[in-house]
Amino acid sequence: MGKEVMGKKENEMAQEKERPAGSQSLFRGLMLIEILSNYPNGCPLAHLSELAGLNKSTVHRLLQGLQSCGYVTTAPAAGSYRLTTKFIAVGQKALSSLNIIHIAAPHLEALNIATGETINFSSREDDHAILIYKLEPTTGMLRTRAYIGQHMPLYCSAMGKIYMAFGHPDYVKSYWESHQHEIQPLTRNTITELPAMFDELAHIRESGAAMDREENELGVSCIAVPVFDIHGRVPYAVSISLSTSRLKQVGEKNLLKPLRETAQAISNELGFTVRDDLGAIT
């Protein structure tokens, strides 16, 4: 028991040396927020303390401060805590400040009405696709688990594969090597071998669209296309999610046409003009 406490203290001291002076409580509070974001139904104080590498009294004091500001509340389970919906309001304000949302939203809403399906819009951040806008289906019954602000892996999502396909040629191999421990089969359809992914990305570049064929979740399919900026880069992607059974009924071609038109409209507003080497979305 004594060794565990000493080890925890040494870990805390090592981390604190790397932080700017006077910011210890801020860093610790933000760390608790990030941990709690993975426990929507609440996390017990003891487990939260263990995950944070802090003693219970310190965690409890920080939680009290977050509670007083309205960001944390007690969960139904005794001794557990969870985040409040105040984060939704804060996140929405941050997202609304992004010009891309104002540019893309009208086009995405029109696509949502035209298809009746779930519409997703993401940006690229390092080795993830981040969902920054989402519209629920108007006619389809499927409600996906994806949420605004979610970091999605590149290898098993349609929009993620778009970023890999239209990114730097050397990036994919580097990504594969550095994320080998994360690249695991989520379903029997998940691509986990690099040669197979190279083939997949070549097809995506040729067709201008990416598919998630139940690679992330059984029963759910997704079609994505790139959004180009004025420099011909792909900072964003738009996709349609729906049940695999409904996709078979509607047909890929019937969804690809309005999806491509939407991506083209957003790309045009970002200053992109179609070139022979980047004409895939037309």
Swiss-Prot record:
Induction section of the entry: Expression of yiaJ is autogenously regulated and reduced by the binding of CRP-cAMP to the CRP site 1 of the YiaK-S promoter.
Record-annotated HTH iclR-type domain positions: 23-85
Ranges of biased composition (kind: Basic and acidic residues): 1-20
Coiled coil feature spans: none
One of the GO BP terms on file: negative regulation of DNA-templated transcription
Recorded GO MF terms: DNA binding; DNA-binding transcription factor activity
Origin: domain of life: Bacteria
DNA-binding region: 45-64
Residue intervals of the IclR-ED domain: 100-272
Keywords: DNA-binding, Repressor, Transcription, Transcription regulation
Region (Disordered): 1-21
A Pfam family matched in the record: HTH_IclR
Known role: Negatively controls the transcription of the yiaKLMNOPQRS operon, which may be involved in the utilization of 2,3-diketo-L-gulonate.
Descriptive protein name: DNA-binding transcriptional repressor YiaJ
Organism: Escherichia coli (strain K12)
Name of the encoding gene: yiaJ
